[in-house]
């Protein structure tokens, strides 16, 4: 049974009134058969890994890893594949863009990197990972380079340009390069995620930097941001909006979130906003790209072991696009891209409702028999003394189990979870 419930709980014995208005439930438009048929992109029989976005004209290029789960995440080596889109609704597959190396080569796996245009060519700086190298006394992760004239056909130049892990840093955690042009200093800046050598449990995760005038000769400049907060930094990103620079990382912890810092200078200091994350535990490894004034965050939502909500999160899953915007105070927020929101037909409207429950939880059904893919929009007002309110959907008719968004007013937060959990 697929239903939507409105629910409310009082705070102690105070009266609790929740008003729900302007409610609409809208089903997904049908798509052309030549494109993927899911709103959130995932190539058939693969799981979407780290994404290295680029943009040209009105097209976003999603260079990304495809995990085959043979027999498990990271089981079968992968390179980078490519899909393009102009609206994050319709995708066109371009196949393999950067193939993996052999089992004997450094880039047995093509780990994350970045794509950019400079010096009359397109460039990829990527992480070559060989899982067998540590037992041979070699660094498992080395930065490598490839070039292209058309974004589709790439030539590896690893015999000309490599970045080996520097002394004092972990040779097996040295990855995810990201390159920008520093206009102020007239040089290229490359940052990557790493950690200090030593026990993996120590909070020595950091972003380090290299600089170059010509993309060929690089100088190691040490730490870019080393806050001592995380065991590892992954997928670093740098971009500027107005007067502010922003540095994003994906952090290693039980939280596994994307966090950001902001500064008026690439030299810091890097300030932590009150809300420094873009999403929760189940959205990871995002990079951004700005095309025609629209900056998109390209991250993935992980699967869980055995597709069981009670299982552990796994690496890779499904791509979800967030649009990044800047608030008046310089902090960042994310929202659904307009093209995704507008990919739905005008749908069913519901009557406004009021839930008045002074002593106990109360529910009211908003919609019966929704499809498995829809958008929902409503204005919600609540009275002083309301403890929480929420929305439940996809209810199991026999057990009463469902998913829910629960807004806990007392704690000033909301959760997405199963109910009961």
Feature-to-residue mapping (PLM):
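Short hydrophobic alpha-helical segments enriched in small aliphatic residues
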Residues: 3-6, 23-26
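A carbohydrate-recognition surface predominantly in extracellular/luminal proteins
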Residues: 111, 363-387
